Structures are given as structure tokens and as C-alpha cells.
Swiss-Prot record:
This is DNA-directed RNA polymerase subunit beta'. The gene is rpoC. Keywords: DNA-directed RNA polymerase, Magnesium, Metal-binding, Nucleotidyltransferase, Transcription, Transferase, Zinc. It comes from Bartonella tribocorum (strain CIP 105476 / IBS 506). Zn(2+) 1 binds at C71, C73, C86, C89. Mg(2+) binds at D462, D464, D466. Belongs to the RNA polymerase beta' chain family. The keyword Magnesium applies. DNA-dependent RNA polymerase catalyzes the transcription of DNA into RNA using the four ribonucleoside triphosphates as substrates. Gene3D superfamilies: 1.10.132.30, 1.10.150.390, 1.10.1790.20, 1.10.40.90, 2.40.40.20, 2.40.50.100, RNA polymerase II, clamp domain, RNA polymerase Rpb1, domain 3. It is an enzyme of class 2 (transferase). GO terms for molecular function: DNA binding; DNA-directed RNA polymerase activity; magnesium ion binding; zinc ion binding. It comes from the Bacteria. One of its GO terms (cellular component) is DNA-directed RNA polymerase complex. It catalyses: RNA(n) + a ribonucleoside 5'-triphosphate = RNA(n+1) + diphosphate.
Amino acid sequence: MNHEVMNLFNPQAPAQTFDSIRISIASPEKILSWSYGEIKKPETINYRTFKPERDGLFCARIFGPIKDYECLCGKYKRMKYKGIICEKCGVEVTLSRVRRERMGHIELAAPVAHIWFLKSLPGRISTLLDLTLKDIERVLYFENYIVTEPGLTSLKLHQLLSEEEYMLAIDEFGEDQFTAMIGAEAIYELLAGMELDKIANDLRLELAETTSELKQKKLIKRLKIVENFLESGNKPEWMIMKTIPVIPPDLRPLVPLDGGRFATSDLNDLYRRVINRNNRLKRLIELRAPGIIVRNEKRMVQEAVDALFDNGRRGRVITGANKRPLKSLSDMLKGKQGRFRQNLLGKRVDYSGRSVIVTGPELKLHQCGLPKKMALELFKPFIYARLDAKGYSSTVKQAKKLVEKEHPEVWDILDEVIREHPVLLNRAPTLHRLGIQAFEPILIEGKAIQLHPLVCTAFNADFDGDQMAVHVPLSLEAQLEARVLMMSTNNILHPANGAPIIVPSQDMVLGLYYLSIVSEKEPGEGMAFSDIGELHYALENKVVTLHTKIKGRVKNMGKDGKEVAKLYDTTPGRLIIGELLPRNPNISFDIVNQEMTKKNISKMIDYVYRHCGQKETVIFCDRIMQLGFSYACRAGISFGKDDMVIPDSKSRLVAETEALAKEYEQQYNDGLITQGEKYNKVVDAWGKCTDRVADEMMKRIQAVDFDPKTGRQRPMNSIYMMSHSGARGSANQMRQLAGMRGLMAKPSGEIIETPIISNFKEGLTVNEYFNSTHGARKGLADTALKTANSGYLTRRLVDVAQDAIISAVDCGTAKGLTMQPIVDAGQIVASLGQRILGRTALVDILHPVSGEVILEGGAMIEEADVAKIEEAGIQSVQIRSALTCETRLGVCAKCYGRDLARGTPVNQGEAVGVIAAQSIGEPGTQLTMRTFHLGGTAQVVDSSYLEASYEGTVEIRNRNVARNSEGHLVVMGRNMAILIKDELGKERVVHRISYGAHIFVDDGDVVKRGQRIAEWDPYTRPILTEVEGYVGFEDMVDGLSVTETADESTGITKRLVIDWRANPRGAELKPAIIIHADKEGKSIAKLYKGGEARYMMSVETILSVELGAHVKAGDVIARLPMESAKTKDITGGLPRVAELFEARRPKDHAIIAEVSGTIRFGRGYKNKRRIIIEPNDETLEPVEYLIPKGKLFHFQEGDQIEKGDYILDGNPAPHDILAIKGVEALASYLVNEIQEVYRLQGVLINDKHIEVIVRQMLQKVEITESGDSGYIPGDNVDRIELDEINDNLIAEGKKPASGNPILLGITKASLQTPSFISAASFQETTRVLTEAAVSGKIDTLQGLKENVIVGRLIPAGTGGTISQIRRIAAVRDDLIVDEQRKSSNNEVAKAMLTNMTAESVSK
């Protein structure tokens, strides 16, 4: 039977399998080979017959028939004439679908330049010809001639001539002595005449000779483009087009609207312009029109083609009839509405529905309630099939009727179909993978979807009118994936931090908390119960209450599997919760024998999950939910206005603060303090007052009081119960209800001095209400901005990390990171245990005392190991990290560690990059948007002392101290550190001690915990003298460089260094304090390093010594107030995270020393200081830095500085950290800084997610030495690619290339990904595609995005496994086919096949 007939209803060609996609510039021959005919007329369709015009933009002869198997004139109809070309109308009889595939072309009368290669930066045409873009445009748009062949004249090649100059040159040299051309023909000639090989060699030679950096950059840029053309096989002249392809008509349709009008695609207008102008130009050339007219027409053709390719890129935008810019071919691809993001990455799906959600507390965790109406519609095909199978209907039509009439059989069948067929529920916005989960549907009446209350946290759903979408997985594979991977019962842990996400909230927490409360003097106190039955009996008969203190016997499984009973002091309520605990030897009653706040419930669920596994946990969660709801209902907790207790002392505290504020006002009026100081003091006072009122209120609300009549404890305050349990509300909200609202901010972010004294219970005055509206309104505006910003951050993160997939089990690297606890101001913010849990140990972890191996290298660090490590007192552990993983594509499982959402080692094919991006992006909306503006006392300056946090022995590193005249030990070095070692000599803690601090301990001293080690003045930076002697001043001229100011409040005068450069007379001054060796001041004391004891002063320095005073080493001679350094804006929240991921250089960034050495001062500039570091390593060159003169600089000449020390304080630029301290330091800096922002909001994110993103930012290397490779210094190359090329070079005995790792921001890194499809769909589509086409890039489809775009399974998860199997199968097929070809007998091939099958089975 004919294969075609078999294929009648599904005439689909077999899908082509391909491994990669290449993009290059289309040559004119290529364009003609695509085309089915030339379009000569601008007409579209005939206005009377509505049939396409011949040779027009919709011509049926060129593009194919309008109706299936029917020619235009109607002579041939039906399938039997397939493939015949009608002799009357010239149309081929075939499917009308070909009108989506067949292209046409337009033959241009004059060549035109392709605007992408002309204008898309860097302009390829201009760079290649080594002309400026302006010059090229002048030639292209017919303003100037260009000399293409100078001959023997004095003209130069590529010289531009205006009309007049051209005429003069003709007069002077004669017309045939030289050639000068104009327009795209000229550029075509120049490009076609280029000898690329020769140019490349010349450029390389020139590069080797040139020394100027600017010239090098220019040459490299040109050489890169020349090499791109050479490698890709593109010819430069193809950037000038002689034929233009016309896209198929069904992709630019003309649609009839009712009322006889037509809607058309903008492309038709743009094509029409090109055809009209081109035809006119042809006519003019035939008519031998004057040159000026022809040139004008050629320019118009060039402009029309420009508009077709990229409207608005050059000249004015071409608009349609309604003044709207026309959408050109480029606009079709660009942006959110373009082809990539709208159609290829954002498809709509069938078999889906959406409805409002309501709570379904009687559902099990793996179920959802699906309205019957929806289910009937969604599962239609399945129902039709079953009706047919059971004989209720014989055709689809009959089945349809039955379903429409809702016959009773249909409902029975629907029940059957739905049983165990999971559906997917999704709530927008889907910020992380838990936003889509699978459930088994339960049919319900009504029209709302029922959702299980415990999964609300994951979906971030509530029942105030939220809607959710339902999707039906159709194929067996999809159902399998939904059940195994996406079922809500399989997603108990949060992928971002591994904590349970199925946690009771609100009512459930309140019910459980109520159950676990203990009350004094309740009936039946002190009774003992032997089992739970007795207890229930006693509760029923009101012998005891839920909160009575009793003794209860709890039975549990022992380690040997036998029952063990134990007596606990507890309450009946807690025993009821304990009843639900799974029977497991590891789980004791202690975890419920406490107040069940939300935190404790979460810990309990986590504990149960770790010890009993998933199934038990799910059952336990469901039971706990039921119990919570039930007792929340029975408790009947509600609150009235009397529950908000206003503290009695409030009025007193407010009055005291008001008096203080008045006093500050008076001091300001008397001129004792400045406006700023007054503001800070008042704000500070009110802040403290608010806190104190809140504390008093909390004391009142928490207080336990007894009923005088019965002697029983009165019920707890309901508001306190809700807030304390974590069910709803916070201490802050309680404060606003019953304390005082406190200070409010203006829209600019400044704090308004007058606070809101009232609370909501008392009610606000009009003034207070007005002040409070500022903040509230700003909050709403911020939220809207925040959502957009956070979404964009997530999009950039996903884009940069989408190709990080677990692709190997173990890469076998010996590199890793060192993890230590994070300590902030003496507090441990992240313990070592938290940071290393679920990571792989790099080397054996040894016990510091016994030396025994706690954990072998390469093993996963589990909870039990963490306990051992912390017990042993280990302070740092080396672990493997995605950052140091050496897998070629993706990351290996060992370096990644535990899959946080499963609690097991990560599987191969897991898309860890996307998970990392989601984990960082999802909490983005919780971060703040504001930049904190801090001033004066509103912010508490760093602590001013240091206490020992461990007991042990002190060791001082880089000891450099002096005893000053008061007998204190003063720190004289800038990199001195105090270590505390325990009795085993192991470092417990290291503190850097700042310059000028007083220390109270010395080497070898034994310290106790809490003993003070050092203290310093946090408000000033001291300048100390290093030698004993007498003070002398240099260039301290009153009124020019110093001034005396009296402190009004104390009357003490102080001498202050002022800006001496402000006055022209003082421009040459260099104010300094010098130390004389003798009292007369004849000789200057020498420092022990050899320099003179001269201390330069900077502006704002306060002098602390008088002229001629005797000073000892370590005495303060001047001090610089830190106020100026402290009032800086701190970028917080989302902008800070974005700044770090984009690797931007912060404003006023720190300057970091690149080498260790000695500081010298060089000759300064007008407003810059030159600082030179002479390296300790003789082989290195001295390094110079320029520092703005007014900036605080605290080194003196001759000081030692270590590599990585800050020469100038500020936020370091991440690039500097990478260049100076290396990858590990950069990683720990970025991880800690990003974590700090999230920690402030109480968001937990595992470090490994940030490390995965940082890994993606560090993929590139900048070539410094090209060796024998083909690279040019300055090239950015993929790190792994470079390693491979170097391995080959070394193997061949050649010189490898070397380079430095460079840090790219996430946007830049996404655009530089090896896949051009992924980069084009991200941002700057035209630029990416232009670049890819010129260099003939090949996309090997490694990442997720490219595969989604070309419509294949993604190479992650199950898709990865399938494609792997396919790949192996394809290789084997080839082997067998080859064998069959080679040998005439088929036996060998059969034997091979049997072997292969056996091999697969054994695997």
C-alpha cells in the first residue's frame, strides 16, 4: 500500500535528529537556493477576487496553493493531482502548509549593506576596512566618494572625496587614471578585494612591534574579526546584499476582518517599500536617468532595506498609517514579545484549567479536590476511550454526546479514569520549583479547587481569592515523573536550605501551642497516669484539664525493638501530641515535651524526617494538622480590645523623653550643638523610649496572674499566645497596638523627629496620622518596584546558571574551600556545623587530640559527623565545592554534596544551576529595596573593646607594641593579631587588633573567658609616635593650615588641621608633626627603619600635643575623628545582592595592596598622593597607587604592608580580591556578603547555591601569554577550553598559553555563554546573533535553554538519561551497520548485537 496514503491524516516528516546548530552569513547563492521565485510586484491580493496577485508578495505560483491540493484557477482539485503544476496559473498542487515554508527573493538593482553588520557594535564592516563608521555611512548614503584604486595618482586608497573634490580629481588626473566609487557598490568592491590571510599576518606582525596600548587594542579588535571570517568560511562581501530573501507569506499573514478591511503584518508594508523603490530604480537605470536621481533612488532602497531588517536603528523610524513604528524583522526576535521569549520559551499548554482555591483540611497530603466540572473537561479524551472500550459508544461523536448530557455512566467512568492519575497544580508566580506540585485528584462538588493546608507555604498561597492552574500530564512518562518527582509528599524539604517546608502555620500552630501550655494550680495537679486511655477518661470527666501539671508514662520502642516505658513530668495536652509520634527508638517524648511554637514544630518535623523517613513523616504531618485544627477550634482563642494592655509607665517614659528633647532643642538654640547632632540625639532618645515602652508592654502581657476566687491561673493573653507561638502577628505589631508606634520615616528615607506617641488602641491624632501615611505609601510603592526587580534578578541568575548540571559522579579534584564559622562582632552567626553539613570532605578530618580519623576524605558530612566534629572542637574544615570542581561541562556530584530537597547525595542530571538561581531569587521579594542612610549616633559604632571568647594562652603575631607615657601597651603595627590557643596548642580564635589600641595581655599570658584583651577609641583614628623625643611643628600656619576652635559645651580649645589648599597662599604647605631628638629642636629623631620621624597631617586631624612637649613611643600626637568616615550610605537588600552578582566596582572602592612590602611616598600630583610599595621580594617591580589627597590614609613612610591589606578603606571591588588574593578569597567574600543581606531578613540559603552562581561567573580566563596557541593576549577564553588546548600543546612539546581568571557579572556571563541561542534569548538579541553569524558559531546544545528552544528534551533529569541512552544506541547502530556493509555474511553483525544486548542488561 502506498506509504503516502497511510500517512494521510498525519503527513509529518520524521523528526530530524541533529546535535548542533550553526549560524553564518547567507551568501547570495544560498539565498537563491532557498527561494522558489522572484517577487517583482508590490501587490498582495486582488481586491475583488481576494486571490493573491501573480509575482506579488503572496503569489501562489511562488509560495504554493491557498487551499490543500487545489490550484489557484481551480483546474486541478483533489489529491490525485498531487505534484502537478497547473499550466494555466502555474501553481503546484500540494498542501497549503508549504506557504509556511517556501521563501521568495527580491533581486536588487543595486547592492545594499546589511544594517546589522554596519551598525551593531562593534561595526564589522568599518572595523574590517579600518575606517570609521561615519566614513562608511557617508559612502553608503551617497555623500562621499571613496577611492578604490588610486592608480599612479597622489590619492590614497580608502580616501574620501566629496562631489567637488571628485570632479577636481577627474579634471586633474583624468577619468581613467584612478577609480573612486560611491554607495554600497564601493564597499562591496573594497570587501571583495580584501586578502584576509595577508591582512591577518600583517596585523600579527604589527601587534608584535607596537607598544602603545591603545593601538594594541585596536589591532586586536581588527585581527579578531579577520580571523572570525577566515575560520568561519564567510566572505566579507556577503555583508553587502544583492538579493534579499522574502519570508514565507503565512508568517506575515494578511487576515480579512469583518467589514471588508484587512489586518496585515507590518513586514508586508516594509517589503512593499523595498519592492516599490527597487522597481523604480530599475526603471530609472533603464531610462538612463541623471546620476543624481539614480543615486537618490539607491539611497532610498538602502534605507528601505535598513527599515525592513531593523527599523529605527538608523535615521528616523518608519511608521505605519496610525503613527505606530512598524515591526521589523529584528523586532520580531527581540524582547519579551519577540520570537524567543514569547513563543519558544513561553508556550501555552492544552489540558489545563484554573479556578479559585479553598482550603481542604480533610484531604491527605498527596490529594487535592478537583471540581467535577473541571475534571470532566480535562479528562475528556480518557473518558471517550473508556466509553468506547466499555461499549457505551461506538464513535467519538456518540461519546461526546454522552459526556455533554452527563449520563450517570460518565461519572462512574470519570472516577475510574481519575483514580491514581496525578494532576499538576501551579500557582503564579512560580518562583521556585515547589510552585508546581503533583496531587491525586479527589472529585468534589462546587467550582473551587481544594488545596491541602500544609502545602500553602510552598506555593505561598492563601485563601483570600488566590487562583491556581491545573495541568494534566498525558503520557505515561509524564504521569510517572509527576508521581515520582513532583508529588507533594516527595517535596517535604526546601531546596534552598534543606529545612522542612511542610510546616503547620496559623491555626494549626495555635492549636498545638494551646495544647502544650502548662498552667499552675489547675485541677488534678500532680496526678500520675499509666496510659493514654486513663488520661482521656480523666479529661472527659474534667478531673484534669489540658494544661495540668501531671506525671505520665510514655511507652516507646527501645533500641532492641522491645517496648520501654518512662515517666515524664508533662501535661495531658502534650501527651496527646506525643501519641502521634512515630514509634522509633531514636524519637523520644522530649521533642514534644516543650512549648510547641512554630520553630519547635519545624524542628520536630525535621527530626522525624531524618530518623523515620518520608512515609512516616507525611502521615505524622497529616495527623498533626488534624490535631492542630481540632484544638484551635476547641480552644476558641479570640481577642478583644482589653487584651491589648497599655503599660502604666508609658506616660512617664514619654514625659521624660519629651523633657530630654526640649533640653536638646535648648542646647541647639544656645549654639552648643549643631543641627545634625540635635537631630541624632532626639531621634536616638525617642528610639530608646519606644523600645522601653514596648518592653514594659511585653512584661505586662506575659505576666501570669491568678484568679483570687478559685486560685487558678488566669488564661494566657490571646494576643501574646498568637504572637509567641508564631501563628500570626509579631512583637512589632503588638507594640503598635498597645505600646507606641514610634518614629516614622519621610519618603526620602529620613526619620521624622517627632514620633507617633499614640498607639492604635488609643487612636492617632490628625498630625500623627498624616506623618504615618508617608511611610505606608512608600511601603506600597516599594513593594511594586521590589517585585519587578526581584524577578529580573532571578531571570539573570537562571540565565547564567542554566547549564550547570550534575554531569559526573566525581571529578577527582584535589582543590576545595576551607570553611570556618562566621563570626560577627563576637557572635557566631553561622556555625561550622551549619556550613559543612551535607558537603563532601576534601581530606581526612582528624581529631585534634587523638589524631584519629573522624571522617575520611571524599565522604559526605552527615548530621552525626557534624556532631563529632563540633565535639572535637575543630574550627576549620576543608570541603569540596562546586567552585573548585574540575568537570568539563557542569558540576560533579561529589563537589556539590547533598541534594537539599531530598537529604541524599545529589543525583546525576540534577539541574543544580537552576535550583541555585531559584533559591537565591525566590526570597528576593522579602529583601528591602532601600539604601540605608546612616548618620551620627543613630547608628551605634563598632564595639570599642575585645573580650576573650575562649580560655587559653595568648600568642601575638607580628608583635609590634610600645609602652606609652601612661604605662599602657599600645599597638604600633598595622597587621598585629592576637591568637588564643587551647591547652593542646590549637588555634581557637584570631583577632586583628587595630593600630593604636591598648592591649592588656602579652605573649604567653593565660586568659579566662570574658577577660578584656584590648580596647580602643571607636570614634577616632590615632596617629602615634614611634620614637621618644620633643614635638615640633612643620608648616602649621595659623589660619592657613591650622585653626583653634573652642568646644562650647566644655570650653576646651582644640587645634584642628584645615584644608590648606583652599587658600592659594597655602598651596605649597605640607603640614606635619616632627619629633626632635633634643629639646632645642635641632635634629630630627630617626625611626628604627631609617626614615625621619615626620608625620604628615590630613584635613580634619585634631592635634593632641603642644609644641615642645616630651613624648614617648606609643603616645598619641594627633587623632582623626571617625564621624566623617561613618556617615556613609550602606546599600542594603536587593540592590546590594544585584551589585555583588553583577560584580560592579563600588563607588569609592577600597584600594588593596598587590604585594607585601614597604611604603614610600612619591611625588604627588595636584590633588592626588602617589604611594609606592617597594616589594620585599626583590624580583618584583615596585607598585604605584594614586590616592585622592583629602582621603584618610593611615600609613606612614617606611610602614610594612602585607599583600591584601587595604591601603584605602572602603568596600573592596571583587575583581581586585580575585586578582590579589585568589579564587578562594573571592568566593568567601561574595558568599559572606550575599549571605549577610539574606541573614538580616532571616532567610536561610545554603552556601552551595551562591557558590554555583559564582562558579558560573568565573568561567572565563584572560590570556596574558599566548604561547604557541592561536590566541591573542587579551582574549577571553573559556577556562576548560584553555586547559584542553594547553594539554594538547604540552603533549606536542609546545609552549602552553597562560591567563588570569576574570570575574564577569551575571549579565555579562550570560551573554558570553558558549551557546548563542541561549545568549540571544536573554538580552541584546541582534548583537549576539550578528557576532555569532560573523564567526560562524556552532551551538552544541549543551544547556537547558537551547534545547527548550529547538524543542527537544532538556539534558537534565530524565531527559538527560534518555538522551544518553539514545547516544549510546546511535553509536552501536553505526557499528552494526558498518559491520554489515563490510562482511557479506550477516552472522558477525548478529553476534555483535547479541553481545551488546547482554551488556545493556548486565548494566
